[in-house]
Amino acid sequence: MKKKTIITILILVLLCVTGGCYFGAKHVWLDGRILPTTVTEVTISGEKLPKIKTLERLDALELLDARKITLNAEQYEQLASALPGCHILWQVPIFGGYHDNIETEVVAASIQQPDITMLRYFPNLEKVDASACTDLAMVTALKAAWPELDVTYRAVLGDTELFQDTTELVFEGEDASELLAVIGYFPQLQKIDASGCGDYAALDQIRKDYPNLTITYNIFLGDQLWPFDTKTLLLKNADGEELQKVLPYFTVLQRVTLTGTVPDQETMYELMHAYPEVVFDWKFTVCGVETASTATELILSDIPMETVDAVEFSLKYFYDLQRVEMCQCGISNEEMDALGKRHPETRFVWSFPFGKGYLRTDETALIPFKYGYPFDNPCTDEQTKLLKYCTDMVVLDLGHMQMKDLSFLQYMPKLKYLILGDTRAADYSPVGYLTELIYLEVFWSDFKESDVLLKLTKLEDLNCAWAKLDRPEALYQMTWLKRLWATSVGIPSSELYKLKEALPNTQVFVHGKHPTDGGWRQAQNYYDMRDLLGMHYMQ
């Protein structure tokens, strides 16, 4: 009996063990519950993550809701690796809090670099609201990492809000440096109206840094507001320090006209050189004469001076001073000439005693007769040597004068009409410098330099009758002449026909008892010359 009982007990124990093993194989103990291994959805909770091996036995599991426990990314990865076919719901630690990984929109009050990586655990995410985040650099990094997401953000500038999709902004703050610091994060911004802001430096920097952005602002100057893109300023009683402070912020300024009281000359000089693209139109005095920086002419004649220092010092205040008249100021010819050479861009005009009057160095037409030099009292080298200063001379009639030195002619590049008839100069070669000559009289003179004539290729009228040409055959080459009077120049009478043959298009006159016979003074160039001299026509 005892043996039979024992066997029965053993059988029962075996059955229990076998049944228990079978049950244990088909069920798991999870979170205080017995769950069949065939379960498809499970929610877990508690302070700790269940053992991974336990969860792995749930081979039919399709959904694991782990949102009631705290997981980190590493733990989630362990779960995902252990349950490859299971959809896991969990609270993702991100943006300083926790968010369901199935959310389509999350709020980011602050963003750290790890947060950007954690976004990969949101398969359904569409939007990130970062409106409360002040770190726009991190917002930009998030956008770059997840371009498919709709990221909203903003910048608060005093009472002004700037959103990511803002295209036009009215900025009324005082400190534009705040705007400068954030504007790069708002690529859709196209236009800024900062008319009420006085932070010119920051606004100007915005303009430079973002050339495709339209920005408007005003600059306060001279009790008036001026748009920064003003081209012309008209200011009365302007302050020099104020000008120096705000002028850098006028971007396309071309002209500043100053009236009333103006800054001192040195301040104006500094401004002129600091802004070479701007014309500063202002008035000042030179030797007691009021003038302007934009003046092209300065008249100082009849003002006694001991030196040219004051005049020369003032030249730097002019933009395009072309002419300065200083007639009878008491300055020597040498000093005036040196002044002009130091400043070739400006024509300096003065006068010197000549005969019964004064001859201006800008004279264009001269006949000594008008200055009291008749034939019986001709001027000499003492007077004519000063003609070298008359560089604008166009007409010069020195016929019958007694000068020997003609070197002054080389300083008359504009000379077109020259009369040296009945003269006895030692050297006529300076005539060769006069390449603009169209009319020349050297009759009854000691002119002998025939080759000089060949340099005068613009010459139209030549009267060399009774001149002492050293090589009269040179005349044969002057085919450009319109008229040639060449009586008794050394060409044999029997060969005069050759001269006419050589110059078929030239009126050649080789006869007569007087150099002007044959109608020499009946030609247009002669009339033009006498008109320029203000003299009557002679026969």
Question: What residues fall within each predicted segment?
Answer:
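Membrane-interface motif at the C-terminal end of an N-terminal transmembrane signal
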Residues: 17-32
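Concave beta-strand-loop units of leucine-rich repeat
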Residues: 37-51, 59-74, 83-118, 123-137, ...
